[in-house]
A protein has these predicted regions:
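N-terminal, polar/charged subdomain of small-to-medium soluble alpha/beta proteins
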Residues: 1-128
Length: 130
């Protein structure tokens, strides 16, 4: 009879090496903003819809008493509103880049999925998005 050689493997996992993966979803944030390259787009604010998925990691669990322990959805919405308040964007792509640049300042954020839609842009078209 063959004897099996079994080894006991001990795994130590320290909490300091553990990452908490978290996600913030913002759906259908609709704002009126100055956006567009063509003259007719510059005449008045346009309705634009934002959908975001922000993934982030943290070495600490969320603290229910400290809002700084999370990526705050209200802060993200406020940031987007601030970006579009006084600036005219010619292109959706430029607006998206500014949103990315601002959000990635938070080092916990490692991935952002952003969809921006121009609503009611043309008579025969329901929306344009990137």
């Amino acid at each position: 009879m063959k004897k099996n050689n079994l080894k006991v493997v001990k795994i130590n996992k320290t909490k300091s090496l553990f990452n908490y993966e978290k996600k913030v979803l913002i759906k259908e944030l609709i704002l009126g903003l100055k956006l567009g390259y063509f003259d007719f787009e510059k005449e008045k604010p346009q309705k634009v819809k934002f959908n975001l998925e922000v993934n982030y990691q943290d070495k600490q669990p969320s603290n229910d008493k400290d809002i700084k322990s999370i990526v705050n959805y209200a802060k993200i919405v406020k940031l987007i509103k601030k970006l579009v308040k006084n600036k005219h964007y010619n292109f959706l792509e430029t607006l998206a880049e500014d949103v990315f640049d601002e959000l990635f300042k938070d080092k916990r954020i490692d991935k952002i999925t952003l969809q921006i839609e121009k609503l009611e842009i043309m008579k025969d078209l329901s929306l344009i998005h990137i």
